[in-house]
Design a protein with these regions (language model features):
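Accessory DNA-binding and partner-docking regions appended to nucleic-acid-acting proteins
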Residues: 1-93
Length: 93
């Protein structure tokens, strides 16, 4: 577990959190978590959000290629996250 934490910190830490898309995805996750009264990590982990921000999927099939997203979570949250990515990309094109 400790090496995994360090690896993720190295891959996604510090500067990565400044990524605007990552911040937008985190905000959406926080909103969904509040609405569902669950911890944010139940929606998606930080590592999943980081991979999503890096890959910026534009379709359901691309979303399924993001680490940590399977059919169930894609069906439940995919539409909201794909819209957030599309909105972000349009605003920052």
């Amino acid at each position: 577990p400790k090496t995994e934490k360090k690896r993720l910190r190295g891959a996604y830490g510090d500067g990565f959190e400044e990524n605007g898309l990552f911040a937008a995805l985190r905000a959406l996750r926080a909103d969904l978590a509040r609405r569902e009264s669950v911890p944010a990590y139940v929606i998606f982990s930080n590592a999943t959000l980081a991979d999503m921000a890096e890959k910026a999927p534009r379709s359901f099939s691309e979303l399924l290629e993001v680490s940590g997203i399977g059919e169930r979570k894609a069906s439940r949250y995919g539409e909201a996250f794909l819209k957030a990515i599309e909105d972000y990309m349009n605003e920052h094109a």
